[in-house]
């Protein structure tokens, strides 16, 4: 067996993009094998949705007229005279002529029809000449709209000499529909429901499409919230902060108390005037997001099978909210969100505000599914070695905590006890808590001119910005850390550790350098020893809390095994936008205690 055929035999097909990939480029953490390119492009949180949609499409699109018989015994074709009868016996849609030296791939992935080829398989997949002018036989209008690119694995081989008269392979219509829908879905485009989809899947398809649009709207809202809210009028900003401080809280259908959802986010949308926007998950823990009360009520009417044809103008009178969990105090949502409150003309009544409650059985909020890690424009960051004392004092720690709204940091708060959220006066941590302290730290560095390290060509692999595109030496597993952040890994204090957790600790090791040009050297808060500017432990809440590794190790050992380890300063520093103190993850603790990290300290001038 030749080396090229051995290489091709090791390749595996990505379930989404239908391209052959080497084993190291595949990820096996999902229900189907997918390549890293698809995961990075779509986001780990959307991969299962796309896999499920593709699986349903394959199940319903039988494509009987598009299937061709398998390879015949004696795989190698003889001369042109011998393959004539074989070509004549094929359906017209599967006949084709080959130009000299041109081949079509004989292997089609994921159950798509296989078209036989006279050329050796290893040549068709490996030879550069096999990829010389490849044109997909798809309608021009789909190509122009960008719905269908070159269909993966179904490219039509065109001869180099256009005068040779070779005809392009014609792709059957059902197969083309399959390609079009799959490509559009994998690109995140909105496509109509295929007319040939089975009725039992049509409703589910529409619901998933609606939910994907709602999640995209939620993601956009959460991503731009810090900047958008800062520019809004103070009454509007105060109302949004007040309402966000009450989330999450349960709501139910007035006509059927068994239909329960939860409100988890608020925002303002500009119509003729600014109006309150509300995001609801229904049912609780399902991940189904509704961006308006009207859409929620219509769905609840359908589920309850009561007055399904009723015309609904405003849904607030059909929804009740729970003021305090477990007390049975349910009130109409219109009492909390009156017309004046929704128009930001009045503040919500203090006695009507609900207390946040997070059900331990469904602790992940839909904000964990948002693509928070995709900035609109890459930032050019330069690293400076010395801190700016003025910049560090520009905003107090309390101002830093209040600078971001409660919902600025989506994550999974499952590590927190439910009683801490149900207690009075406790701000909810749901989507206010961060997946890990380092993510909050990176957000602080990105949005506020406080002390922050600047990446450069010589930055260490343990930099706080490890894994960013402009870092030339990312930490090992940096991609896993990004995927874990998207997928909502348990945050600080969780007993579950893993590769992403260890990588997060590597980022914590990086710490935040500084943003100033010259000033006092970096010193450990405990021992006052001078710190190397990129290797120390940084508290994500208080910029002035910086610790060397020996002091951090001593502090962790003093806490004893199994206990929560908070800021080495001895204070329980809360995450920005929340009253919940951050704590080290178990993987971070293990990394710090694994051994001394010896770094070369800068010499005093």
Swiss-Prot record:
One GO MF term attached to the UniProt entry: transcription corepressor activity
Function: Acts as a transcriptional repressor.
Residue segments, region Cys-rich: 524-571
Entries under InterPro entries matching the protein: I2BP1/2_C3HC4-RING_sf, Interferon_reg_fac2-bd1_2_Znf
Regions of compositional bias (Polar residues) in chain numbering: 460-475, 492-506
Cellular component aspect of the GO annotation: nucleus
Keywords recorded for this protein, A-Z: Coiled coil, Nucleus, Repressor, Transcription, Transcription regulation
Top-rank taxon, per record: Eukaryota
One Pfam family cited in the UniProt record for this chain: zf-C3HC4_IRF-2BP1_2
Name this protein carries in UniProt: Interferon regulatory factor 2-binding protein 1
Biased composition (Basic and acidic residues): 92-101, 385-402
Region feature (Disordered): 61-130, 373-517
PANTHER family the UniProt entry points to: INTERFERON REGULATORY FACTOR 2-BINDING PROTEIN 1, MYELIN TRANSCRIPTION FACTOR 1-RELATED
Organism, as annotated: Danio rerio
Any one of the GO BP annotations: regulation of transcription by RNA polymerase II
Gene3D superfamilies: Interferon regulatory factor 2-binding protein
Subcellular location: Nucleus
Family the entry assigns: Belongs to the IRF2BP family.
Any coiled-coil regions, as ranges: 200-229
């Amino acid at each position: 067996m030749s080396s090229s055929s051995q290489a091709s035999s090791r390749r595996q097909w990505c379930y989404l993009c239908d391209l052959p990939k080497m084993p190291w480029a595949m990820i096996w953490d999902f229900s189907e094998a997918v390549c890293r390119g698809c995961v990075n492009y779509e986001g780990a949180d959307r991969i299962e949705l796309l896999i499920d949609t593709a699986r349903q499409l394959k199940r319903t699109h039988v494509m009987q007229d598009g299937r061709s018989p398998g390879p015949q015994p004696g795989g190698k074709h003889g001369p042109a005279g011998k393959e004539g009868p074989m070509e004549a016996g094929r359906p017209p849609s599967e006949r084709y002529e080959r130009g000299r030296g041109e081949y079509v791939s004989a292997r089609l992935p994921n159950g798509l029809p296989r078209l036989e080829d006279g050329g050796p398989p290893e040549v068709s997949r490996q030879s550069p000449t096999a990829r010389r002018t490849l044109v997909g036989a798809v309608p021009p209008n789909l190509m122009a709209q960008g719905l269908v690119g070159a269909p993966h694995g179904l490219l039509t081989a065109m001869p180099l000499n256009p005068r040779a008269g070779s005809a392009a392979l014609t792709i059957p219509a059902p197969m083309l529909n399959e390609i079009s829908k799959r490509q559009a879905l994998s690109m995140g485009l909105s496509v109509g429901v295929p007319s040939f989809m089975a009725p039992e899947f049509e409703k589910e398809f529409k619901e998933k499409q609606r939910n994907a649009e709602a999640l995209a709207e939620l993601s956009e809202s959460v991503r731009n919230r810090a900047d958008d809210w800062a520019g809004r009028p103070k009454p509007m900003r105060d109302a949004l902060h007040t309402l966000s401080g009450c989330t999450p809280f349960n709501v139910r259908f007035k006509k059927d108390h068994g239909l329960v959802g939860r409100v988890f986010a608020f925002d303002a949308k500009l119509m003729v005037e600014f109006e309150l926007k509300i995001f609801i998950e229904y049912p609780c823990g399902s991940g189904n997001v509704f961006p308006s009360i009207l859409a929620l009520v219509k769905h609840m009417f359908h589920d309850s099978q009561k007055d399904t044809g009723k015309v609904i103008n405003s849904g607030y009178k059909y929804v009740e909210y729970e003021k305090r969990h477990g007390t049975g105090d349910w009130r109409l949502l219109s009492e909390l969100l009156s017309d004046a409150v929704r128009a930001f003309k009045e503040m919500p009544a203090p006695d009507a505000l609900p207390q946040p409650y997070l059900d331990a059985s469904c602790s992940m909020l839909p904000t964990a599914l948002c693509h928070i890690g995709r900035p609109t424009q890459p930032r050019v960051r330069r690293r400076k070695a010395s801190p700016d004392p003025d910049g560090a004092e520009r905003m107090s720690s309390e101002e830093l905590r209040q600078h971001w709204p409660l919902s600025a940091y989506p994550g999974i708060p499952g590590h927190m006890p439910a009683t801490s959220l149900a207690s009075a006066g406790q701000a909810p941590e749901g989507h206010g808590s961060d997946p890990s302290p380092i993510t909050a730290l990176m957000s602080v560095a990105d949005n506020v001119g406080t002390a922050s390290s600047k990446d450069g060509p010589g930055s260490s692999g343990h930099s706080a910005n490890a894994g960013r595109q402009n870092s030339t030496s990312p930490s090992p597993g940096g991609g896993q850390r990004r995927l874990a952040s998207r997928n909502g890994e348990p945050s600080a204090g969780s007993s579950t550790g893993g590769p992403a957790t260890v990588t997060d600790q590597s980022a914590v090791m990086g710490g935040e350098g500084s943003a100033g040009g010259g000033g006092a050297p970096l010193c450990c808060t405990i021992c006052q020893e001078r710190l190397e500017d990129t290797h120390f432990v940084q508290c994500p809440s208080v910029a002035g809390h910086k610790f060397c590794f020996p002091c951090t190790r001593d502090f962790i050992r003093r806490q004893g095994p199994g206990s929560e380890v908070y800021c080495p300063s001895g204070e329980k520093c809360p995450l920005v936008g929340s009253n919940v103190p951050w704590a080290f993850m178990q993987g971070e603790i293990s990394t710090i205690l694994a051994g001394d990290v010896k770094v070369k300290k800068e010499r005093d001038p």
